[in-house]
Design a protein with these regions (language model features):
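Outer-membrane beta-barrel pore domains
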Residues: 25, 125-126, 288-499
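Residue-level detection of beta-strand scaffold positions
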Residues: 34-35, 55-56, 94-96, 170-173, ...
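Gram-negative bacterial Sec-dependent N-terminal signal peptides
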Residues: 1-20
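Outer membrane beta-barrel
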Residues: 83-282, 365-400, 405-422
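N-terminal periplasmic/intermembrane-space "pro-region" immediately following the signal or transit peptide
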Residues: 20-103, 109-117, 377, 381-396, ...
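Secondary-structure boundary/capping motif
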Residues: 34-35, 41-49, 154, 168, ...
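Short solvent-exposed loop/turn micro-motifs enriched in small/polar/acidic residues
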Residues: 80, 162, 213-215, 312-314, ...
Length: 499
C-alpha cells in the first residue's frame, strides 16, 4: 500500500503541470517511462486487492473463540450446595442458607388392659390406637454476618400453630475458643437434648427429656470450645422461660452448665460429659410436674405422671457417655433430679402461690437413665461434632446406584417418678408420690437413601409399675397401687427430609 501511494504521488508530481501553463511537447523517452509506471501501478493495485480478498476470506473461515466452560460459569454464578443453596460472600463476611425439616409420623399405641369408653381414671382411651401426625414442619435460615456474628432462625408450623425452635444470634471470631450465644435454645440439658431431632437414634429423645420438661428457653450462654481438634466444650448459661409464653409474669429462670471431653483412643472416639441445671419456678405458679409419653408422640397419653408438686424449683445433675467405633456406637446417660418442695402449711404473699400444687412432707427425688447401642450395616460411622451427635456421611447414596445407609439401634430407657418422702400409712400426699416407673425396650431401624433423607421404623415395649393409671388399667388387684404392673406396646414410622 505504501509503495503504491508513493508511485502515484511520484507520477502526479511528474506529469502534473500548472493549470495555467501552456502545454509543451513531451519527449518520447519520458512518455515511455510514464506508460511503464502506469502499468506497474495497475499491477500493484491488482496485487493489493488480491491480498485484501485473501485476508477477508481467512477471517471469515476462522472458528469463533470457544466460550468459557459451562462449569466455570456455573461456579461463578451459582451458590454452594449443602442440602440447600448457600449464598456466601467470604470477603464481605456474609452468608445465607435457607433450611427446613419435615417429619411425618404414623403409628400405634396399644391399650393396656380392657378397653374402656372415653376417659376413665385420667386415661383417654380415644387417644390410643392408630394415629398419624406431622411431628415437625420447620422452616428457617442460618448464616453469617461481618465481624464473626452468626444467626439461626427456625419456626415450626406443625399442628396448625407457629412454634419457635432455635432462634439465636452467635458471636465467635475465626479460630477463637470463645463462642457467645443469645436467643431461644436448649439450656445445656444433656447429650440427647443438645443433639438435633434430625439425627437422634429413635423417634423421640430419651424419656428424661420429656419427663423433666426440657424445652428451649430464652437466654444467653458463653462457651469455651476447641476450634482445632474439637476435643472439649465448657458452656455456662442463664435463661428465662420459654419464648412462646405470652404472659408478662415470666419470673421463672434457670442456670445451667455443661462440659464435654472427646478424646480419640486408638480407633475409638469417646464422649465424656456432665451437666447441671438449677431451675426456679414462676413466682405465682410455684410448682413442678414430671410426666412422659410412651416413647412416641402419636399419642398425648402418659402412664407416668407426678401431678403438680408445690415447689420453688428443682436441681438436676447428669452424666454422659458415648463412643464411636467405626460402624458401632454406644451411648448412655443418667440424671438425678431433686425437688425443692414446700411443706404443708407454707404461706405466700399476695402475688405468690403454688397454683394447685400439692404439698409434701419432704423433698422428692426422681431419676432416669438410658443405654443404647447402634450399628451401620453399610459401613458408615455416626457423626460427632462439638459435644453432640452430628450427621453421618452416606457412603453409597441411592442416587449413585448404592443402597444408602442402614442402621439398627437398641435401647433400654428407665424412668422412676415414684418416691416416699416421709413415713405414712397412705400412698398419696403428703407422704408418697405415686408417679410410677417406666422401663422401655426399644428397637429402631433407620434408612438414609442420601445424607438429607431418612426413613425410620421403631418398636417399643413399655413396662410400667404403679403410677396414676395403674388403678384403672389393673383394677381389683390385691397389689398396692404403686406395685401394680402392666405393659404398653407401640410401633411407629417416620418419613423425614431436611435441608
Amino acid at each position: 500500500m505504501a509503495k503504491s501511494a508513493f508511485l502515484a504521488a511520484l507520477l502526479a508530481t511528474t506529469v502534473a503541470a500548472p493549470a495555467f501553463a501552456a502545454p509543451e511537447p513531451v519527449p518520447a523517452d519520458v512518455a515511455a517511462d510514464v506508460a511503464a509506471m502506469r502499468e506497474e501501478i495497475a499491477a500493484l493495485r491488482a496485487e493489493v486487492a488480491e491480498l485484501k480478498a485473501g485476508r477477508d476470506a481467512a477471517a471469515a473461515s476462522a472458528p469463533a473463540p470457544a466460550p468459557a466452560p459451562a462449569s466455570a460459569q456455573a461456579a461463578s454464578a451459582s451458590p454452594a450446595w449443602k442440602g440447600a443453596p448457600q449464598f456466601e460472600d467470604r470477603e464481605a463476611g456474609f452468608s445465607f442458607k435457607p433450611k427446613g425439616l419435615v417429619q411425618f409420623d404414623a403409628g400405634f399405641v396399644g391399650i393396656p388392659g380392657p378397653e374402656l369408653s372415653g376417659t376413665v381414671g385420667g386415661l383417654n382411651y380415644n387417644n390410643l390406637g392408630w394415629n398419624s401426625r406431622a411431628r415437625r414442619l420447620v422452616l428457617g435460615a442460618e448464616g453469617a454476618l461481618p465481624g464473626g456474628f452468626g444467626y439461626n432462625v427456625e419456626f415450626n408450623f406443625a399442628q396448625g400453630a407457629v412454634d419457635y425452635e432455635d432462634i439465636v444470634l452467635t458471636y465467635q471470631r475465626p479460630k477463637s475458643p470463645v463462642r457467645l450465644t443469645i436467643g431461644n435454645f436448649y439450656p445445656l440439658s444433656s447429650l440427647e437434648t443438645m443433639t438435633s431431632s434430625r439425627l437422634t437414634s429413635f423417634l423421640e429423645r430419651a424419656a428424661f427429656t420429656d419427663a423433666f420438661g426440657y424445652n428451649r428457653r430464652l437466654g444467653a450462654a458463653v462457651a469455651l470450645v476447641d476450634p482445632d481438634k474439637d476435643l472439649y466444650t465448657l458452656t455456662a448459661g442463664l435463661f428465662g422461660q420459654e419464648i412462646n409464653n405470652a404472659g408478662f409474669n415470666r419470673t421463672g429462670w434457670q442456670a445451667s452448665v455443661r462440659g464435654t471431653f472427646a478424646p480419640t483412643v486408638g480407633d475409638v472416639r469417646l464422649h465424656l460429659g456432665a451437666n447441671f441445671q438449677h431451675r426456679v419456678a414462676q413466682r405465682d405458679a410455684r410448682n413442678v410436674q414430671y410426666r412422659a409419653r410412651p416413647f412416641t408422640q402419636v399419642t398425648d397419653q402418659r402412664f407416668v405422671d407426678t401431678s403438680l408438686i408445690a415447689a420453688d424449683g428443682d436441681d438436676i445433675a447428669g452424666l454422659e457417655f458415648g463412643a464411636i467405633m467405626k460402624s458401632f456406637h454406644v451411648a448412655a446417660e443418667a440424671q438425678q433430679l431433686w425437688v425443692r418442695g414446700y411443706r404443708p402449711g407454707r404461706t405466700f404473699g399476695a402475688n405468690d402461690g403454688v397454683a394447685g400444687g400439692l404439698f409434701y412432707a419432704g423433698d422428692p427425688g426422681f431419676r432416669s437413665a438410658y443405654a443404647e447401642v447402634g450399628y451401620y450395616f453399610t459401613g458408615e460411622s455416626r457423626g460427632y461434632k462439638g459435644g453432640r451427635w452430628d450427621r453421618p456421611k452416606v457412603l453409597h447414596p441411592f442416587n449413585e446406584g448404592g443402597w444408602g445407609a442402614l442402621q439398627l439401634n437398641a435401647r433400654l430407657d428407665w424412668l422412676d417418678l415414684g418416691d416416699r418422702v416421709a413415713s405414712g400409712a397412705t400412698l398419696a400426699a403428703p407422704y408418697y408420690i405415686n408417679g410410677g416407673r417406666q422401663l422401655g425396650y426399644e428397637l429402631s431401624l433407620i434408612w438414609n437413601p442420601t445424607d438429607y433423607l431418612r426413613f425410620q421404623a421403631q418398636y417399643a415395649r413399655g413396662s410400667y409399675q404403679g403410677g396414676p393409671r395403674a388403678a384403672t388399667v389393673v383394677p381389683g388387684s390385691s397389689e398396692p397401687i404403686n406395685l401394680r404392673d402392666f405393659s404398653v406396646d407401640s410401633m411407629a414410622l417416620r418419613a423425614q427430609v431436611d435441608f
